[in-house]
């Protein structure tokens, strides 16, 4: 088996694990276990928090002491067992405690799998995209498998429900632990990566345009969790009516669109419109999606609007990493990438998870959740971000100042 094939399988399993539970866990927490919106948000906030902490844990182990494939195997095996145990947790305290430990184990593998792939590819700049896309395919496959599992199990209630998404993720994690021993040997580096390296890039914030860009990115990232946490419960509500068995498969529409936009849309848009206009399309797509959710009708339009995730995520967040790589001075480029990852994928999503959960509580009564009220909040905030971006952000000036 070629190294590329083994790396592709690694990425497939890495994101199949995440894709098995992340899109639908909130439905289980809110509807089956009776957690509040804030409690569900707090559980989703654990992975972004672990992402911030992971450079101090798994990254240091792999960089200094052990080969990366062995660290991945240990983390995934232990994490898989924890997920299976977590599937039987019913109290908030037990669920939160188990999930926090699990997230501390899983978060380092996100960076480690990228590192293993890049180190073992002959031309990582050209070949990494073709390997990474298997991660998104794995996410989609997990959703389809969970839907199939639920359909075979009767669709609701029954043997296959409960914490089934955590069982599936746990099983995939154990399989990945075994597959890790087939990965190319990746020994530890002589010098570890500094976990505080992102601080070196803070001087870039002196540039007005870059500071505006980071501020807008942070606010938009907080609103991402309204999609990840609340879309599942919203689609399964009476107003939309997606069944529990079909929900995981329906949610994969977003990732299918992400693959399409990544493969065909992003490079075309960057060449035709440039960085600023591409980012603008991405940030404007956010309030469009949330206003469709807020109206909540017709149901087919709400479901179809999941495809906007391709533009929301790829044209803004993926393009944002490309922009930072473009404007950062060469000597702090890696630090700048670490900074935007912490701002957008760490702190932003951590606070956004808590915020989304709290907003869901505010608009929930004994009669149910007012989804119009819920989604008007991220609609208003992302609209403000879009207006601020169009009025104040200028790519050319930002690039010059940051450099």
Residue ranges, per PLM feature:
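Helix-loop boundary and gating motifs at the non-cytosolic
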Residues: 1-48, 209-250, 317, 353
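Conserved MFS/SLC helix-loop-helix module at the cytosolic interface between two early adjacent transmembrane helices
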Residues: 53-90
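Hydrophobic core of transmembrane alpha-helices in multi-pass small-molecule transporters
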Residues: 12, 82-86, 92-112, 116, ...
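Helix-to-loop junctions at the C-terminal end of transmembrane segments
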Residues: 53-67, 150-154, 261-275, 360-361
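A membrane-interface helix-boundary motif in multi-pass transporters
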Residues: 148-172, 358-382
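Juxtamembrane intracellular "pre-TM" segments in multi-pass secondary transporters
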Residues: 1, 183-216, 237
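Structural signature of the two symmetry-related core transmembrane helices
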Residues: 70-84, 277-292
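Multi-pass alpha-helical transporter architecture, strongest
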Residues: 86-87, 173-184, 376-403
């Amino acid at each position: 088996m070629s190294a590329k094939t083994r790396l592709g399988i690694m990425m497939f399993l890495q994101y199949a694990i995440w894709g098995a539970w992340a899109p639908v866990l909130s439905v289980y927490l809110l509807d089956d276990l009776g957690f509040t919106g804030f409690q569900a948000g707090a559980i989703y906030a654990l992975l972004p928090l672990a992402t911030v902490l992971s450079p101090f844990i798994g990254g240091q182990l792999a960089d200094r002491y052990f080969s990366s494939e062995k660290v991945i195997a240990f983390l995934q095996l232990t994490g898989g067992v924890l997920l299976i145990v977590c599937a039987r947790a019913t109290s908030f305290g037990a669920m939160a405690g188990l999930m926090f430990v699990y997230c501390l184990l899983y978060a380092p593998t996100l960076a480690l799998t990228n590192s293993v792939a890049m180190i073992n590819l002959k031309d990582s700049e050209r070949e990494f995209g073709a390997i990474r896309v298997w991660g998104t395919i794995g996410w989609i496959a997990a959703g389809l498998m969970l839907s199939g599992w639920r359909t075979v199990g009767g669709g609701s209630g029954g043997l296959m429900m409960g914490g089934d998404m955590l069982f599936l993720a746990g099983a995939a994690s154990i399989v990945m632990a075994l597959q890790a021993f087939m990965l190319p040997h990746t020994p530890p580096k002589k010098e570890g990566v500094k976990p505080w390296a992102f601080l070196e890039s803070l001087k870039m914030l002196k540039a007005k345009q870059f500071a505006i860009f980071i501020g807008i990115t942070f606010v938009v990232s907080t609103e991402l969790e309204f999609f990840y946490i609340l879309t599942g419960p919203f689609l399964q509500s009476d107003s939309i009516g997606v069944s529990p068995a079909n929900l995981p498969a329906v949610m994969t529409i977003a990732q299918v669109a992400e693959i399409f936009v990544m493969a065909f849309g992003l490079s075309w848009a960057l060449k035709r419109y440039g960085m600023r206009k591409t980012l603008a399309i991405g940030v404007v797509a956010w309030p469009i999606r949330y206003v469709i959710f807020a109206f909540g009708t017709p149901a087919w339009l709400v479901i179809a609007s999941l495809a906007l995730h391709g533009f929301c995520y790829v044209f803004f967040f993926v393009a944002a990493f490309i922009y930072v790589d473009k404007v950062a001075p060469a000597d702090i480029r890696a630090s700048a990438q670490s900074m935007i990852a912490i701002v957008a994928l760490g702190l932003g999503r951590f606070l956004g998870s808590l915020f989304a959960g709290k907003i869901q509580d505010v608009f929930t009564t004994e009669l149910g959740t007012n989804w119009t009220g819920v989604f008007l909040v991220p609609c208003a905030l992302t609209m403000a971000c879009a207006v601020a971006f169009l009025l104040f952000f200028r790519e050319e000036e930002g690039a010059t100042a940051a450099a």
